[in-house]
């Protein structure tokens, strides 16, 4: 995990993330019975949200890179997964796409999902250097000490989605109209 010096190289992490993303796309489009399975519009909503989330992840990396860039792959994967989840929910018309909804959803998703995965990855990578292995006590300590960092990261992601989320979604909507991804 540490710049290709651990059990996984960054390229391998990217490949696993891409496979997970594609599996999520296949799962998100599996419920559409009336539309042909090869029709791209089935998964267009989640794809647009994943692209918006990846752009937000890249912008947050450019403005706040931090001292350690070894978790860049994790950041992209989790932002993409959060975008996919947002796309599935927005596609089913359960949530309106406004600044407040995007902000709340981003905060909760980054705090719970991204923070949870990062804390587990810290436990897994740290257990390789100790003889103790995994324990629930270690996981509890990691989650409690990680709350301030998870809150800060969720807050920053929320700010970026409130500022840049709707303009990016509007631009992607224009692209969808321009290239005829909408059915008339």
What kind of region is each of these model predictions?
Residues 10, 29-184:
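Membrane-embedded alpha-helical hairpins and interfacial helices in multi-pass inner-membrane proteins
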Residues 5-13:
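Hydrophobic/aromatic-rich structural module bridging two neighboring secondary-structure elements via a short loop
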Residues 2-6, 26-33:
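Membrane-helix exit/interface motif
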Residues 1-2, 16, 20:
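Small-polar-interrupted transmembrane alpha-helices in polytopic inner-membrane proteins
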């Amino acid at each position: 995990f540490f710049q290709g010096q651990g059990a996984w190289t960054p390229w391998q992490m990217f490949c696993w993330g891409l496979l997970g993303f594609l599996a999520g796309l296949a799962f998100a489009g599996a419920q559409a019975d009336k539309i042909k399975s090869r029709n791209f519009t089935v998964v267009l909503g989640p794809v647009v949200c994943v692209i918006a989330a990846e752009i937000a992840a890249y912008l947050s990396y450019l403005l706040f890179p931090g001292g350690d860039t070894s978790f860049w792959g994790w950041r992209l994967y989790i932002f993409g997964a959060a975008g996919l989840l947002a796309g599935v929910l927005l596609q089913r018309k359960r949530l309106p796409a406004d600044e407040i909804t995007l902000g709340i959803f981003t905060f909760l998703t980054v705090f719970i999902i991204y923070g949870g995965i990062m804390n587990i990855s810290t436990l897994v990578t740290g257990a390789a250097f100790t003889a103790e292995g995994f324990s629930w006590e270690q996981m509890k300590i990691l989650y409690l000490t990680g709350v301030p960092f998870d809150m800060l990261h969720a807050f920053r992601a929320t700010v970026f989605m409130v500022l840049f989320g709707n303009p990016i979604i509007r631009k992607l909507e224009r692209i969808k109209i321009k290239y005829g991804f909408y059915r008339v």
